[in-house]
Amino acid sequence: MAAAAGDGTVKPLQSAMKLANGAIELDTGNRPREAYTEYLRSIHYISQVLLEEVETTKEAGETVPPDTSKMLKLAQQCLERAQSTAAKLGKTRLKPTMPAAAPIPQPAGRHRRVYSDEGGKLSPFLPPEIFQKLQGAESQSCKKELTPLEEASLQNQKLKAAYEARMARLDPSQAMQKTSLTLSLQRQMMENLVIAKAREETLQRKMEERRLRLQEAANRRFCSQVALTPEEREQRALYAAILEYEQDHDWPKHWKAKLKRNPGDLSLVTSLVSHLLSLPDHPIAQLLRRLQCSVYSALYPAVSRAAAPAPGCCPPTPNPGSRRLRPSQSLHCMLSPPEPSAAPRPQDSPPTPPLQPGPVGSPSPLGDTASGLPDKDSSFEDLEQFLGTSERQGRGRGVQPEPQLQQLKTAVEEIHNAVDRLLSLTLLAFEGLNTAASKDRCLACIEEPFFSPLWPLLLALYRSVHRAREAALSRSMELYRNAPPTAIGIPTKLLPQNPEAKGATGYPYCAAAQELGLLVLESCPQKKLECIVRTLRIICVCAEDYCPTPEATPQAGPPPIAAAAIGADDLLPILSFVVLRSGLPQLVSECAALEEFIHEGYLIGEEGYCLTSLQSALSYVELLPRGGLAK
């Protein structure tokens, strides 16, 4: 009954996520104007809710609710997407050359759909030439200084206009004055051109002298060897271009002085790199755009050739009596709404209905299948055995085509090389960044703008490679969506002792599932990893709330996961339950991509522990038994 009571309560965060999901679906369906409206409506709703909460807490003298930070983050994401959609509306609108197919329910995605070159087939991504045009639009809008000859041409046009006006005012009888004006005009125009040509030659000579001088400085900075690779030659040319840029601008000198005065200030590093990449005429910012276009052009054909849709869109043959998984046309990863089931679920609720981890006599269709599950006390102790079985099954049932794997490896290598080039060039330009802490912060600041336009396409390729695993995970999510927490292996001591008091949250660890759902809104590996860390911290906080430990001592700041009250044997079943409730099979591909692109230094600390725990939970959920469910 308590679960039923919880069904009627819809949290504002859930409603806000539903609004954002609807806007993303419109954006995916090539309806940018409607999507822009829905993004603004989502922001307005979140602002209204937070304003009401502030007024309520002001009257009651309470603290800020815990969902406020999530609401603000969701509003920030909606605002960024609204800005992106508004920019697209102001640029070239692509017109379809063929009529669209019959409408099919589309999962949410990051980019609007346009027509690709492959026979009118729908593609969720912009063609490379359009992507390159959008990336270069900002740099083309930069102010360009006029050359001396161009300035002289403008001056001569003004002189000619003044001459024609004076000639129109003279009488036909004033022939001598007309001749004088004509000769004067010709003399002035010729003088302007001669002076401009001399200035241009002098300027070109000085520019060439400066270029040679800066090239020599760049050569001295690098090791002097006769045979240079193309990459080394380009690196020298870029460094010389940076030196030339610094000759014409003063701000790099000021920033270098700031770094010298405050060598350990990481906020200064963040501000510097953000400012640097925001200037479209800086050589490093220009290199970033060129590398983005190169990676995008390499990814686009590989993703376009992956014609088969991704899970929950490429279902395996279902067992008799079981339901087929919902097909989809998109390779995107954005908050795919689950298929309506025979058991009604409220539209405003999270991906699964609130459940009561209560008595054994639950009417859930999984109530009689607990015996078919692994023993909840020992299931996670044998996790290595399950993971080994998963690897063997993966090798046996669906080896990916070699070309697709090779395309992924090539793309990953190109991305690593691109990021390394950007980082090394930035460290060359600003020597004050060449410390361990500053280098890590600089890398994080470079990765965010670099990955933002590329991540949806990159993830689509990962999803096509991991389609079989995502299908298995999607099927487990479908079969176990109503499973009580105890059936997944969560001990009762780590569940709410007074479920009626927790009715508003819907189900145990609901906050962790909501936080994990925010991961797909990010487009930077570092921010995605931070979302995973927050998810596990929320799990630990919820577990301590459900089962407080008297010996726990307060400590400043958020405790590391390893120091939490629950151990790995308790954390993994809880995390598996959270994964089931997230309804996001694309987490398999997200984690595979994060493991590849996260810096090694993070993988040996708390972040690496959290990522490994999530991967273990995903592998376990994939292998949940199928027997006894098709009744």
Curated annotation (Swiss-Prot):
Keyword line: Coiled coil, GTPase activation, Phosphoprotein
Coiled coil (residue ranges): 187-221
GO molecular function: GTPase activator activity; guanyl-nucleotide exchange factor activity; identical protein binding; small GTPase binding
Keyword Coiled coil: yes
Tissue-by-tissue expression: Ubiquitous.
Single GO BP term: vesicle-mediated transport
Residues annotated as domain VPS9: 467-630
UniProt key word Phosphoprotein: yes
Domain of life: Eukaryota
Residue ranges, annotated region (Disordered): 318-379
Modified residues (Phosphoserine): S116
Record-given protein name: VPS9 domain-containing protein 1
Species for this entry: Homo sapiens (Human)
Lineage, uppermost ranks: Eukaryota, Metazoa, Chordata, Craniata, Vertebrata
Protein's gene: VPS9D1
